[in-house]
Regions:
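Small-residue-rich hydrophobic transmembrane alpha-helices
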Residues: 52-111, 115, 148-167, 280-344, ...
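Helix-terminus/linker motif at the lipid-water interface of multi-pass membrane proteins
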Residues: 31, 35-53, 121-128, 184-195, ...
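Transmembrane alpha-helix boundary and packing residues in multipass membrane permease domains
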Residues: 26, 30, 41-42, 59, ...
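Short alpha-helical transmembrane segments in multi-pass integral membrane proteins
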Residues: 1-23, 80-146, 192-250, 306-375, ...
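Short runs within selected transmembrane alpha-helices of multi-pass transporters and secretion channels
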Residues: 73, 141-160, 167-175, 200-216, ...
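N-terminal transmembrane alpha-helices
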Residues: 10-42, 46-47, 60-75, 79, ...
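Small-residue hotspots at the loop-to-helix junctions and early N-terminal turns
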Residues: 49-60, 138, 201, 275-290, ...
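Transmembrane helical elements of multi-pass membrane transporters/channels
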Residues: 21-40, 140, 174, 207-211, ...
Length: 458
């Protein structure tokens, strides 16, 4: 039945309200979570430029591996959202349990890789002094990895159940404590040894565990969650559901691994241009990552919203939810892009003393990177939300192929050609990222449009 114009506007307003109700706390939480690595990057710069460069290697390594694992675990949220939408309360606890077992399965091998990642960094041609310093960071933050995955599962479940607000409170406290812990452990206050870059890693480990314990405690004592019997999750191993979550998560891990892996590979190639270029790249990436948390938060919301509506078999509304979220993020990222273009010096000044002549090359390079980063974050935001909507539909296989083609063939391949073959230098790598993200945004958004058009017509 066709909707009248008034009815359509009414449903559209209701969908915007529903998306915002879920998205706002998730965006705030995501911003606060991203505040930890951003704060770490700023405080690395307080040590010296080498600590900032080495910290970039360590941070991007940990972030890449952690993000892949979190992406795999996002399949838990999709399953919980489907069960919640369908009113299958018993399936909520069962899906949560399988997610916990999956996290346990991944934890030890990934921690082993992080511990020994210095060998891989050396093979990529990084300066040995930077690698040795990055190793101290990696071998301290690695102990927070299990807690980071645990918090991820609790975030997925609470978001799928429309109860993410308490996460904001926890992450506010975590960010404030992280600043204090960084300062104390970096510079050796209150009788503690000055650990330098390693101190930042230990501070992150502490915050990961405190956040996880706080979230688990909140869920245990919040009456809202009692009907879902999440405390029994570990006692309900379901082989079929475990395999289903793993299969869905595996493709999500590949998709996000391909995406984030491009940024990792780009950082490694930036290292070939020297410490100053790598430091400038770290400034741009950290700032970019912080801004993109808004898009990532909205993408979590659209995944849960589309997943819930899919569970209700209301696929027309699921289509509307995806398009509404894409429309919501576009004005924000456009404004931020203008800030990147107009005020790059103020952004760089958050990390380094721009009046220090020793930093002049870093400032100049970072300014050019930020101009390219402005374009990057517009298309990154669009493709991230489109990908989130497709996850809610449990469409994962084709998006993996799209992501690999867009990022690795178009993005990294094009960036390498421009940077090294054409001789454009480090900025060529950022131009390659722009090409890859434009391609990814177009293809993923187009696929969501095609799938939902088929749904509506069918």
């Amino acid at each position: 039945m066709e909707l009248t114009s008034k009815e359509f506007k009414s449903e559209l307003i209701l969908e915007v309200q529903a998306c915002l109700q879920l998205a706002v706390p998730l965006v705030i939480t995501q911003i606060l979570e991203a505040g930890i690595p951003l704060l770490d990057g700023v405080m690395m710069g307080l040590l010296n430029s080498q600590a900032l460069a080495a910290g970039a290697l360590g941070a991007v390594t940990f972030s890449t591996l952690a993000s892949v694992c979190r992406s795999i675990l996002s399949a838990v949220g999709v399953n919980v959202a489907n069960a919640f939408g369908a009113g299958k309360i018993d399936q909520v606890s069962r899906a949560t349990g399988q997610g916990i077992w999956l996290a346990v399965t991944m934890c030890l091998p990934v921690m082993f890789i992080i511990w020994h990642f210095d060998y891989i960094l050396l093979l990529t041609g990084q300066e040995e002094s930077n690698v040795l310093l990055a190793q101290t960071y990696l071998r301290s933050i690695v102990w927070g990895f299990p807690a980071a995955l645990g918090f991820c599962i609790l975030k997925e479940v609470s978001s799928a159940l429309n109860r993410p607000q308490f996460l904001t409170v926890i992450t506010v406290a975590g960010l404030l404590l992280n600043a204090v812990a960084n300062y104390v452990l970096m510079f050796g206050k209150f009788g503690l040894p000055a650990l330098g870059l390693a101190g930042i890693g230990w501070a992150s480990t502490l915050i990961f565990w405190l956040n996880f314990i706080a979230a688990a405690s909140w869920i245990c004592f919040d009456n809202y969650f009692k009907d879902y019997q999440l405390d029994c999750a570990l006692h309900q191993f379901d082989k079929d559901m475990f395999i289903d979550i793993f299969q869905t998560g595996w493709f999500l891990g590949l998709q996000y691994g391909a995406e984030i892996g491009v940024f990792t590979a780009t950082a490694l190639m930036m290292g070939w241009f020297g410490t100053e270029t790598l430091a400038a790249h770290e400034i741009t990436v950290e700032t970019e990552s912080f801004v993109e948390t808004v898009s990532i938060g909205i993408s979590y919301a659209v995944t849960m919203r589309v997943g819930q509506l899919r569970g209700q078999n209301d696929l027309k509304s699921a289509s509307r939810a995806g398009l509404v979220c894409i429309a919501l993020v576009t004005p924000f990222v456009s404004i931020v892009a203008l800030i990147f273009w107009l005020f790059p010096n103020y952004i760089v000044a958050m990390y380094l003393d721009t009046s220090n002549l020793d930093n002049i090359e870093i400032v100049k390079t970072a300014t050019s990177f930020l101009a390219a980063g402005a374009i990057v974050q517009i298309f990154y935001s669009i493709q991230t939300i489109a990908a989130g909507a497709l996850i809610g539909l449990k469409d994962t296989k084709v998006p993996v192929l799209i992501t690999m083609f867009a990022y690795w063939v178009v993005g990294l391949g094009g960036g390498y050609l421009m940077a090294f073959t054409f001789g454009w230098g480090a900025i060529g790598l950022w131009l390659g990222l722009i090409l890859g993200l434009v391609m990814g945004a177009m293809l993923l958004t187009g696929r969501f449009y095609l799938l939902t058009s088929e749904i509506e017509s069918g």
